[in-house]
Amino acid sequence: MDHTDEYIKEISEKIDSKKEYYVEISNKIWEFAEPRFQEYRSSELLQHVLKQAGFSIKADLAGEKTAFIAEYGSGKPVIAFLGEFDALPGLSQKADAAERIPANPGSCGHGCGHQLIGTGTLASAIALKDFVKEHNLQGTIRYYGCPAEENAGGKAFLVRDGYFNDCDLALCWHPEQGRRACYGSTKANFRVFFTFHGTPAHASMCPELGRSALDAVELMDVGVNYMREHMIDEARIHYAITDTGGDAPNVVQSRAQVLYAIRAPKITQVKELYNRVCNIARGAALMTETTVEIRQVAAYSNLISSKILADHMNAYLEKLGPITYTEEEYAYAQKFQQSLSDQDKNQLPTIARDYFGPKAAEVMKKPIFEPMAYQNLYSDLKYSTDVGDVSWLVPTVHLNIPTFAAGTALHSWQAVAQGKSSIAHKGMLYAAKIMALTAIDFLQKPELVNKAREELTKTLNGETYPNPLPKDLKPEIW
């Protein structure tokens, strides 16, 4: 007998009945806006809520003070919900303001919706816990409090230290332009500091005695830019000069530093590019008679999506139907669409085609993309996520739900500004329902868990997880 409609009603009621509570939690995390590995208040709040809901807590994991696992139940399957809560530096923004108004200039802001991710997965885990208890089901529900997704890859440290070894499924979600569970991958990624050390000297009186670390940084950047012609099209390399050596031009800079992000579709390709970039850095040091210190601080593996999990999620997306919005919410979204740059506005048709194909023109008539986004489900994504590291060990699904005006770029002030809106909260609670309903299918049918594991084994085709972190690397605030 099919109980799908009953379960949809039950899970929806469990989540909707606590709507104001979850909105308050999300808004508090938005206000905390704490950077990577410093999400102390956000982590404490989430732990408190889960403990109150009947979960046991293990905290301070893998050298990450703000990481934790909340657990309920026992036995198999072990279902992991991946929560995030770190904010982005320099993106502070006044809520609901459709113009650039930093709330606290220079501070962090939630430009990637992690306050929604952390709270939405929490709501889903609690609803599933209540369902399991009431229906007397066996299984273990875990909420993973995952810090530092941005720039530091916090999950990779948790994976390396074995915290996912006994998991059977992993569910997560992310704000995006359309409703869908994708089958595609994300880019693998290394984050590496190159610090050059030279010799200071008076730049006019005795420049011949100086050896410029800043020259080395600039030569390295030029060398990498020439390398771009000779790497695969799908690769991306970005850099930020984090230390120019000071602000005195009459002193030869004795220290300078640059941070590189190296991306490619597969971790093996990233390693190859990394070795080439390191050689360019050594060459720059040789040319300038400086020395270079190379320090990798983070790594992200490419995502391996579970089609079986995604199929179940997409079926529930169809069953639940589109999120409904009010005229006031459409007007709110329209206001933010108008705030976009001309370049961003010109990208809207392309975004709509990527998500909705031939339906793009019709979908664009509203300022929030509503239908199922079936176009390009197999397309690989341009960004990186440390969910990828989990996915090499555990069948994993990555759900996308809209939480902002169509065309809003992630990591933008517009994304921060809309983070406390009713549009954002509707998307968050909708995602919570989809994840809980998907988990119920796999709790009740062990054969689905086995199929998901078999699918992952087949996809890997003999490959083993190439843990990209150096063995001695510890999480650090940088």
What feature does the model see in each segment?
Residues D5-E6, E24-K28, E99-S107, F196-S204, ...:
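A short small-residue
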Residues D2-H110, Q115, T119-T140:
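Acidic/His- and Gly-rich active-site-bordering loop/insert found
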Residues E218-W478:
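Metal-dependent amide/peptide-bond hydrolase catalytic core
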Residues A80-L82, L91, H197, L399-P402:
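Non-cysteine beta-strand/loop elements that form the S-adenosyl-L-methionine
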Residues E34-P35, Y144-A148, V297-N302:
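Conserved short loop/turn motifs at secondary-structure junctions
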Residues T66, L88, A97-G109, Q115-L116, ...:
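Histidine/acidic-residue-rich, glycine-tolerant segments that coordinate divalent metal ions
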Residues Y7, K18-I25, Q38-V49, P77, ...:
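General structural feature for long, well-ordered alpha-helical segments within catalytic domains
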Residues I29, A70, F81, H114, ...:
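Divalent metal-coordination and catalytic microenvironments
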